[in-house]
Amino acid sequence: MNSLCVLGLGYIGLPTASIFATKGRRVLGVDISPAVVETINSGRIHIQEPDLDVLVRAAVQSGNLKAATKPAPADVFILAVPTPFIIAADGSRTPDLSFVEAAARSFAPLVEAGNLIILESTSPVGTTEKVKGWVEDELAKLNRQVDGLLYAHCPERILPGQMLKELVSNDRICGGLTPAAAARARDLYATFCTAQIFLTDARTAELAKLTENAYRDVNIAFANELSLICDKLGVDVWELIRLANRHPRVKILQPGPGVGGHCIAVDPWFIVDAAPQEARLIRTAREVNDSKPHHVVAQVRAAASEGGVVACLGLAFKANVDDLRESPAVEIVAHLAKAGLKVLAVEPHVRVLPESLQGRAELVSLDNALARAEVVVLLVDHRAFASLTLAQLAGKKLIDTRGAIR
């Protein structure tokens, strides 16, 4: 297993490819974006993550990491491509596996006997089996029969902002379509993983990752629902949670403006889609968290004058990252702009607004926003906002969705 082909060079694929390369494996990273390929081959990065630039530079300079837009033969193929969902007209969500299918079909003609094929992308139960089917379908078109192919699902469990640490130190699950596939995957990840690696079947591994994120989503929904109750009853939710958590067996999370990111805001829907009648609590939690941005928008509109200036602090889905995927903050800004308010967006981790906000909001500095706004909305508790105090916001209306400004 000396050569690897990693398909998808985003937040998961790039760190994974790079760490394998620095451990002596020959890695080809594949991405459909020529700009991403050019950036990585020059030893630079296109995403923000602490110390990732150092890792990628070392991997490229070692000669072990190269990037391309097309796959090449390898001992191991790792799929780390997006798995979003499609929203139907009736509001139902169904998994979109088109990126996984395209990636699998792209390398299928290159496989040889004994190759290991790993799905890292968080996926609905049964996706690893579908990858096997897509590969076999492409081989059939070529009248090729390749024996001994091994398939496994090895979901990532890393947190943006701490990816490189958690990539090494977090336990891993390797679920194979066969025990031999799981064992081979374990041997591969032992290259850099210092934690325990647990073996299981592919379907259990797929559901385990979805379960982890659904569990977190349900707990966040409880906190968010508490915040709605407290707003109605005139209670400080932050004080309430602080006191309730003094109970030795209570650990309530903190509420926020919603839930974002490509994991927690997406993965529970895969369970709901697979078992809609059984996943009632999981569905309700998703609905609670998805509704929270609308509550924040209503609060801001009630506080602002008609056509007033509103400063929205933070666009990322969580603190201290540049990842805007599924961000409730972006959704809130879009709704406020649509309502006719002048929105000043402050996001220290990006240089340009996402396409959905261009022409609808203005990206400004924190000082600029505070000087101009009548309403200040804290959406993300970035370190850059940690020094803000109520005294600095005197004369302005504050909506603090994070309970961070005191």
Predicted features along the sequence, with ranges:
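Structural/interface elements that position substrates and couple domains in central-metabolism enzymes
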Residues: 1-406
